[in-house]
Swiss-Prot record:
Function: Purine salvage pathway enzyme that catalyzes the transfer of the ribosyl-5-phosphate group from 5-phospho-alpha-D-ribose 1-diphosphate (PRPP) to the N9 position of the 6-oxopurines guanine and xanthine to form the corresponding ribonucleotides GMP (guanosine 5'-monophosphate) and XMP (xanthosine 5'-monophosphate), with the release of PPi. To a lesser extent, also acts on hypoxanthine.
Location of the protein in the cell: Cell inner membrane
Binding site for 5-phospho-alpha-D-ribose 1-diphosphate: R43, G44, D102, D103, L104, V105, D106, T107, G108, A109, T110
Name the record gives this protein: Xanthine-guanine phosphoribosyltransferase
EC number from the UniProt entry: 2.4.2.-, 2.4.2.22
InterPro entries reported in the protein's UniProt record: PRibTrfase_dom, PRTase-like, Xanthine_Guanine_PRibTrfase
Binding, GMP: D106, T107, G108, A109, T110, W148, I149
Length: 168
């Protein structure tokens, strides 16, 4: 999302739905591997990377930390932690047989940065928006560019008043 526009549509995702979607992603990726390591783009990629790594039997999990959002506002990209030298070596220096996992590709800005680090890696996301979709190799669900996905780790349970009491 741009820094000046709030999303037009909301797409809340429950833990159950997210787990199902991650398993579906794993099923698709099972035909693509084998992978020597999984690289999670943090923080959003941590949960799907853990599920995918478990399903594919991958033991080596690394992270790359690129900050691009502050709550709903997009900010300048900052690499806070790069991929370890050991993981890069496992991928032959170019990312071959490495699997990069994130929750979502939005504009593709984060994916471009990581692709620059390991260009031959396989990129997988659970959700993809049209602007970022060309940068990923495998995804499960496409959502429109004007949709904000509310992931389960970003939500809290709250009381919802009955409709008869004026709830919208």
């Amino acid at each position: 999302m741009s820094a000046h526009k709030t999303p037009d549509k909301a797409f809340p995702v429950s833990w159950d739905q997210f787990h199902r979607d991650c398993r579906a992603l794993s099923w698709r990726l099972n035909e693509t591997g084998p992978f020597h390591a999984v690289v999670a783009i943090t923080r959003g990629g941590l949960v799907p990377a853990a599920i995918v790594a478990r399903e594919l039997g991958v033991r080596v999990i690394d992270t790359v930390c690129i900050a691009s959002y502050d709550h709903l506002h997009k900010s300048e990209l900052k690499v806070l932690k790069g991929i370890s030298d050991m993981t890069v070596k496992l991928g032959g220096g170019s990312g071959r047989n490495l699997l990069v996992v994130d929750d979502l590709v939005d504009t593709g800005a984060t994916a471009r940065v990581v692709r620059g680090m390991i260009p031959d890696a396989h990129f997988a996301t659970v959700y993809a928006k049209p602007l970022g979709k060309p940068l990923v190799d495998t995804f499960i669900t496409e959502v429109s560019q004007d949709t904000w996905i509310y992931f389960p780790w970003d939500l809290d349970l709250a009381f919802a008043p009955p409709l008869r009491d004026g709830a919208a």
